[in-house]
Amino acid sequence: MDSLPLSNIFHRKTRTVMTSAGVALGVALVVLTVGLVHGFLYDQGHRNAAVAAEIMMNPPGAGFGFQLSTNLSMPTDAIDKLRSIPGVSDAVAVGRYTHGLGVVDGIDYDSFTKVSALRVVEGRAALGGDEAMIDRVLQASRKLKIGNTIQEFDRPFKIVGIYEPESLGRIKVPLGTLQNSMNRPGFCSTIFIKVADPSQQDELARRIQEQFPKNNLFMTRELPVLYATGIPAFNTFLKVVVGLSVIVSSLVVLLTMYTTVTERTRQIGILKSLGASRQWIAGEVEKEALLITLAGVIAGLAISVAGKYAVQRFTPLSIELEPSWLLYALGLGLLSGSLGALYPAARAANQDPIAALSYE
């Protein structure tokens, strides 16, 4: 009788495979979605922190990164005032336009290179008109080269340069072009401030805040941590995805085990007439469910690893498969299997042996 779960699994191979596949898809959904969100936030944090400037000043009410408004709302006149503050080495305006998960940066190349390590490694800088520079990751994922065009603002931009290292958005156009395209000349999205003495950056940030009390200041060294803690909307989204995955996986297991118990009604009646306890029968049903679920979880993790390499091979997106979340997915998968088998296990355990033996 100890082999009952395994014998049932191998007796109904197709149903076992389909159930495990359902669990696997649920696990892969959770792992890849969480990995995509965490990878996106991690990538954004480090690309924003790659700027050599120590302080980032945003418009009133604006957060950081993708919480920035897509409208250029901060006057570039603030740059002259910032440069006049003792301790400020330089201040550079950057326009940012967000579309989907992509960002187009508007920069003045000569000014931006003073506050970052960005350098053109192929072609030349985008200095005016409908010209664009892209980074190596975007170039590789889209198989682009110098002279190709990309669509931005509903018109083609000619790629004139490839830059390294990755910083901010993956596409950079002249700031004036971005301002004119958005009908916001004289405005920007954020200002990066280079500090003369990095050891005094906190004190300088305090003095800047006094002169610009309505603006939001962020230290670029803290951006990876800010992104790592996530954006509230993303965290809510992840909770919904995890919850739906557990529910769907539980329903898949419940349906399978309910069918199994119904098919084996006579066998259960025989076992009970031979003295099998209710706890033992319920335990056998749970064992079978957990074995099927475990196979599904392992398959789901394998799908997740393969999916990560496929996504990163063909897109500029990054997926972070953190060990803690892999263990979390394992626990969620087994939990969903256990919950899904509760009702079938209780139904099997509570069957009347006489009625079960007469079941056709």
Task: Name the predicted role of every residue range.
Residues 95, 102-108, 119-177, 187:
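Hydrophobic secondary-structure segments that place a key small or acidic residue at a functional site
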Residues 9, 261, 270-279, 351, ...:
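Short helix-to-coil transition segments within interhelical loops
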Residues 13-40, 232-267, 293-299:
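Hydrophobic alpha-helical transmembrane segments of multi-pass inner-membrane transport and secretion
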Residues 245, 258, 266-312, 328, ...:
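Transmembrane alpha-helical interface segments in multi-pass membrane proteins
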Residues 55-56, 138-139, 160-165, 186-212, ...:
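A short beta-strand structural signal in non-transmembrane regions
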Residues 325-360:
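C-terminal membrane-exit region of the final transmembrane helix in multipass inner-membrane proteins
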Residues 28-103, 206-210, 214-216:
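Hydrophobic, regular-secondary-structure patches
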Residues 44, 206-251, 260-265, 270-271, ...:
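Peri-transmembrane interface segments
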